[in-house]
UniProtKB/Swiss-Prot annotation:
The keyword Transmembrane helix applies. This is RNA-binding P34 protein. One of its GO terms (cellular component) is host cell endoplasmic reticulum membrane. One of its GO terms (molecular function) is RNA binding. The keyword Protein biosynthesis does not apply. It comes from the Viruses. Acts as a ssRNA-binding protein that may be involved in targeting RNA2 to replication sites or facilitating RNA2 replication. It comes from Lettuce infectious yellows virus (isolate United States/92).
């Protein structure tokens, strides 16, 4: 399990601080400060650190953040990106390098080219409110952060084994990589601040994006949700999902022929559906085994 690093703790505090600044803007908060903090702190390097447990000196990066120095922050990111490129031990780092490329520009290969970085150029030339700039940076950051389709969950070995914490996260009864729970909680916060949507809608959106990273921890294991999709595709099945009793007793039923799956969760429809899929998969496998 990955321990919470000083960098991660600082990140969470800065994200909270930035959200406060967006809500209560002051003249002392420069445009680049808001955009820089949201873009880099809610998206960037700490994601890589948490995903792979990669040890790296981040003191210069932290110092540049504390001083609100965008140029030094970019220099540190360039240096860290170059170091990550040299490490082949963690396949997930390829994904991390891609994140940094998105943040600092693909053509940014030398420190003396920093002034050409699109982030700096936009912040220097744009003349609009800091709230708008901050929110746009957050949207870009969330887009990069949530684009996790290339991240291979098989390389994420850090599982959340604390049953109490696992149940609190409502990820059904399956192991959850520690990084997923961290991302889940953080992203709910920043997305809620940015959109003002109902918190339940925000939770559902985040869960849908991160669900594929939930797995049992055994090599080659597929979550029941993934297995459900595979079974339906391979066997050309079109199960019927019945929601009509969810508002009364929290139950959702999935039917396909004589195979039925039922899930119950009175507070979260998504989790009731997932449990119904899990039971459907179990019953479908049992039926096929009996027919062999």
């Amino acid at each position: 399990m990955i321990m919470m690093s000083p960098l991660y703790a600082l990140t969470k505090q800065c994200v909270i601080d930035t959200a406060y600044r967006l809500a209560v803007p002051t003249q002392h908060c420069a445009i680049y400060t808001v955009a820089c903090r949201i873009l880099f702190l809610s998206v960037g390097f700490m994601t890589i650190v948490k995903l792979c447990g990669f040890k790296m000196d981040t003191s210069s990066f932290i110092a540049s953040i504390e001083k609100d120095n965008l140029m030094d922050c970019l220099i540190s990111l360039v240096e860290m990106r170059d170091r990550l490129r040299l490490c082949n031990d963690f396949p997930i780092l390829n994904y991390g390098v891609n994140i940094l490329e998105l943040l600092i520009g693909k053509r940014l290969n030398k420190i003396n080219n920093l002034k050409n970085c699109y982030v700096i150029r936009e912040l220097i030339t744009i003349n609009i409110s800091k709230e708008w700039v901050g929110k746009q940076a957050l949207k870009v950051g969330l887009h990069c952060f949530l684009n996790l389709s290339q991240a291979d969950s098989r390389h994420v070995k850090y599982l959340l084994s604390d049953k109490e914490s696992l149940n609190k996260m409502n990820f059904s009864r399956y192991y959850v990589p520690k990084v997923v729970t961290d991302l889940y909680l953080d992203l709910i916060g920043v997305l809620y601040v940015n959109t003002g949507y109902n918190i339940d809608l925000v939770e559902k959106f985040i869960f849908d994006k991160l669900e594929f990273l939930v797995y049992d921890g055994e090599e080659g294991f597929k979550s029941p949700q993934v297995e459900y999709n595979d079974i339906c595709t391979v066997n050309n099945l079109k199960p019927i999902i019945k929601y009509n009793r969810w508002h009364t007793d929290g139950s959702i039923v999935i039917e396909c022929g004589d195979v039925i799956g039922k899930g119950i969760n009175k507070t979260k429809k998504k989790f009731a559906i997932n449990d119904a899929k899990a039971e459907f998969v179990k019953n479908f496998k049992a039926k096929n085994k009996n027919n062999e």
